[in-house]
Amino acid sequence: MSNKESTYNKKNRLLAFTASITLILSLSSATIAQESYKKDFLYRRGTQLMLNGEPYQCASFNSFQLCGCGHDYELFSDCQIDSLFALLPKNIIVRTWATPAFSHRTDFLVEMARKHNIKLLLSLADGRSGCGDFDGAPNGDGSGKIADWYKEGYRKKYLPHVIEMVSKYKDAPEIAMWEIINEPADADWLTIRDFLHHIAAIIKKYDPNHLVESGTFAGWAYGGADNYKALHDSPNIDVGNLHEYDYDYENSNTIESWHFAPCLKAMQELDKVLIVGETGINSGDGDCRTTRSQRCDAMRSKFDIYLQKGAGAVFVWNLARESRNVGLTFGLDDPLWDLILTYPANERNSTTSNKNYTQKEKP
């Protein structure tokens, strides 16, 4: 073969290769552009939360008081919840309880979320057995659950509750995701894994429209990052969770928890979402090393670093109508509240539902 022919063949092969790559990229882009989603339902594209065809993140708060649990001075009236939700950035997610003991207010919360265009992350049980969720608790409030509850005990009360809740609200876009249980523990990790996988499959069976989130601690509670990853390797679990209160640990002023990176890596290897379901800093008007203003600044830094590194959402613990003590709880007069209302990611989400969609919507 002449040098001229060889050069000609190489050029043709290069052109063919380039054309193939271009075709693959264009098909991939077309697939993304035409992906199906249900309008106003939160979903995921791998490790990225999505809403109406747009990437989604938020910085928000927990408030178990919204479900009716708490001291009288902490609780919100129906009118106050209406006003509270009206102030929130559109499409923000609020995490609260919908446990067997405190699901009587869920209808109202969903109604208010629909009215004000926000979303709810609802936890279906409390592994710490708080707020009256004493099923499986060895010693009442805050005592956790016995190991046998995660093996068989959950089938008596909790499982019917799960089926009832997810069936009832399966068509409600106001639900951002279902949390299987808050902070499962007190059993070996294999038992907890089997429990999470079973409940996730049940939820998806009765409600294929919503994301399923684990509710877990970080990997330390389950023997390390590999076990944490195994807890989430079910195809029916979409979102992993970690809770961290490391700022006050040994007065370290920690911003990025040392548990975050291994949890994020585990979820990225599974091509799934990670959220920071709880983070908090002690403060208040009494004797405390951290002022409310300092707490707000530190929490802004936490929001920034977790979202920049890939978390889908971050939730501060914990909003109540009024906070009377030094602690993690904050009220509407706290700088944290203003931070949440004005945080850039939340303001961006406010316009998501008003965009012209180029992607295919499911009815």
How does the language model describe each region?
Residues 276-279:
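Short acidic/histidine-rich active-site segments
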Residues 247-263:
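Substrate-binding surface in catalytic domains of secreted glycosidases
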Residues 1-12:
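N-terminal secretory signal peptides that target proteins for export/translocation
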Residues 37-239, 249-251, 265, 269-272, ...:
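Active-site mouth of glycoside hydrolases
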Residues 31-33:
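Boundary at the C-terminal end of the N-terminal hydrophobic targeting segment
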Residues 18-26:
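Bacterial N-terminal signal peptides
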